[in-house]
Amino acid sequence: MAEQHNEPKKLGFAQLAALIVGSMIGGGAFNLPSDMARGAGTGAVIIGWIITGIGMIALAFVYQSLANRKPELTGGVYSYAKAGFGEYIGFNSAWGYWLSAWIGNVSYSVLLFGAVGYFLPMFGAGNNVASIIGASVLLWAFTLLILNGVSGAALINLITTIAKLVPIFLFIVISLFMFNFDKFTFQFWGTSDLGGIVTQVKSTMLVTLWCFIGIEGAVVVSGRAKKQSDVGKATVLGLIGTLIIYMLITLMALGVMDRVKLSGLENPSMAYVLEFAVGKWGAVLINLGLIISLFGSLLGWALLAAEIPYVAAKDGVLPKVFAKLNKKGTPSGSLIITNLLVQAFLILTLVASSTYQALYSVASTAILVPYLLSAMYGFKLALTGETYDKNPTGRTRDKIFGGIATVYAIWLCYAAGLKYLLLCFILYAVGIIFFYIGKKQNNKDAEVFVGKEKILAIIVLVIAIIAIVMLFNGTITI
């Protein structure tokens, strides 16, 4: 008798928006004051946010347009890359996104118990034995929660998103009352040791680069949305809301403490800014907010990390085990494999933290590939006119947003650095094995690489080999 699956509950607008905001506003938001001040003056910080805002809003509108014009593509970044550029490129989009998601959850676990260590010193900086035990218990508790149904997990993510915004809003309001315009304008364009304006702006871009990972959250789970029209709206409104919050955190802090003091604060710097303004309770409040924030981010990214390989496996480009569903309609195979890898890397942080940090940087770079491919696909549709024959409204707008988003995504790849891009190819080369298995399981007689895909796979392998050689001869280091 066939296994029965209950129809999974669908996600509404509020849950989709919370998934986006909850995924983007993680631990990094609480350290923005010092991270931004460390390499730039106030003027360069403002320019950096303007550039980031333009690029990310363009990308958000690309996702909105794709969700509206291609509602049948319910696999998000994977589906867009596959539809635009073929199966193998689509697979690489899914592979890079998945790597980034689960290795990112390792980082969130360490940061979470580091924040708990502020109140309970036994957890230290988040990477000792007590922390790893705590993180492991939390990891598998989340796994059981998600296995019980995606909708219930999304509801908890909505609650934690609202809860973590409270201390952030309090920080902004208190900072507004403590704001000193003279501090804000002092050395407005930075000092000579920071370099020129272009150098300063670039330093802020390297920070903001990581702030918006999660913008694609709604399109990744679009197959579980009640209404496809909610996907685009949640993406754009979630992005704009998050951008405003980030800008206010950064600029208000520059009006409470001068840039030099801000740049020297420990993590989470927002806590020490508020402690400077109102006393010890300010730091306690922000650290509690950080714990809630990371708790929500862990849950949100656990959802996203399981969804993409599930969709790819259903399409036959990943092994079938990733496509297994439980009775609740949750991708149990993908979820368990993903969290087993998270568990392994949590243990790795005990014995080889530097290796873990390098792999995390590589995996974070890998997520830029799905962003670039999504932007290029949106731009391609607008240029060719596909889907615009019956509804030409907004084609010029979509060309503009698609072009801006594509240029911005290329810039982000450049900002990530050649070293991590090269190392990234090693991970993509490993992915070829999984792609081969998935294709053969789906159809043992099918050709694995079609047309130019063979050339692309060879290029990936060659660059990966070059990167490995450069690692061994010391040209690049981990």
From Swiss-Prot:
Q: Which Gene3D superfamilies match?
A: Amino acid/polyamine transporter I
**Subcellular localization, as worded in the UniProt entry:** Cell membrane
**Catalyzed reactions per annotation:** L-ornithine(in) + L-arginine(out) = L-ornithine(out) + L-arginine(in)
Taxonomic source organism: Clostridium perfringens (strain 13 / Type A)
What family, per the record?
Belongs to the amino acid-polyamine-organocation (APC) superfamily. Basic amino acid/polyamine antiporter (APA) (TC 2.A.3.2) family.
Entry protein name:
Arginine/ornithine antiporter
Kindly give the Pfam families that the UniProt entry links to this protein: AA_permease_2 (PF13520)
What job does the chain carry out? Answer: Catalyzes electroneutral exchange between L-arginine and L-ornithine.
UniProt KW keywords: Amino-acid transport, Antiport, Cell membrane, Membrane, Transmembrane, Transmembrane helix, Transport
Matching entries from InterPro entries are given as:
AA/rel_permease1, Amino_acid_antiprt, APC_superfamily, Arg/Orn_antiprt_ArcD
Q: Which NCBIfam families match?
A: 2A0302, arg_ornith_anti
Q: List residues traversing the bilayer.
A: 11-31, 43-63, 83-103, 106-126, 130-150, 159-179, 203-223, 236-256, 284-304, 333-353, 359-379, 417-437, 456-476
Q: Give the Gene Ontology MF terms in alphabetical order.
A: arginine:ornithine antiporter activity
Keyword Membrane in the entry? The reply is yes
